[in-house]
Amino acid sequence: SDVCSSDLVGLLGGMFTLLSLSICGAMYHSGLGWLYFTLFTVLGLFMGVFGSVFNTFAGLYQAKDNDLLLSLPIPIRAILASRLLGVYLMGLMFSGVIMLPCVIVYWIAAELSAAAVIGGLALILAVSLLALVLSCLLGWVVAKLYSRLKHKNLLTTLAALVLFGAYYAVCFRASALIERLLAHLDQVGAAVRGGAYPLYLMGRMGQGDWLAIALVLAVTALLCWLTYLLLSRTFLAIATAKTSETKKAYKEGKAALRSIPAALLSKELGRLTSSPNY
């Protein structure tokens, strides 16, 4: 699994490096270098949340050793911090393979200065932290719903399939969307600046705007603190909540005779609907 993960990270890094090389120069020379960073910020947040949201739910609230750790004289804040570190590193891996090529290509093809270097590194940090915040909030919502639903594994599996479908739909349309973006840079830039000012500030941050760097980092730190405060007040109740599922009683009966392919198919379908990770 480690080899597969490294291959996936390498593949994504190569794809987004090529994307950076293809659009960075045109956007920078059009005076829209900030829009270049804004585009990759959105992609980085999407990938960071997509890559870590399920790990947030399973690793934070459904970890098998939660009961053991909570029974030991370990502060809850220490347990929560260790769980959040794992979630953060997962999100950093997925967002970093997008943001790191974006920043390096900008330094090479557009501008290399102290402000640009600091702004680029700060942008990578901000995106990874915002991905952590969004993953934690989504994981918290999922955990609250999960504790009240029946057929939890089936619903979680369906939700995962929907997210995967949305992800691949975006990937397949990425080239067409980028072509439309490049054809209407001025209109897109005006729309983002007027209707999504925080994203504009993050784009300016990547270019080395000191005011944008200070504002974005301050807001990001505040959001991280509020998220930790929310999780610290609800973690114990959710992590120790007993599920409402009832176990089926075994009833003796005759097993139907099936062919080997049919039996294997039935077994795999059962695993698919009972295990979200599968």
Spans of model-derived segments:
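Short, small-residue-biased leader/transition segments that mark boundaries at the very start
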Residues: 3-5
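Transmembrane-helix bundle segments that line or gate the permeation/cavity pathway
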Residues: 52-62, 77, 81-241
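Loop-to-transmembrane-helix entry motif
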Residues: 88-92, 268, 272-276
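Juxtamembrane inter-helical linkers in multi-pass membrane proteins
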Residues: 236-266
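Short helix-to-coil transition segments within interhelical loops
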Residues: 70-75
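Long, hydrophobic alpha-helical segments
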Residues: 12-14, 36-56
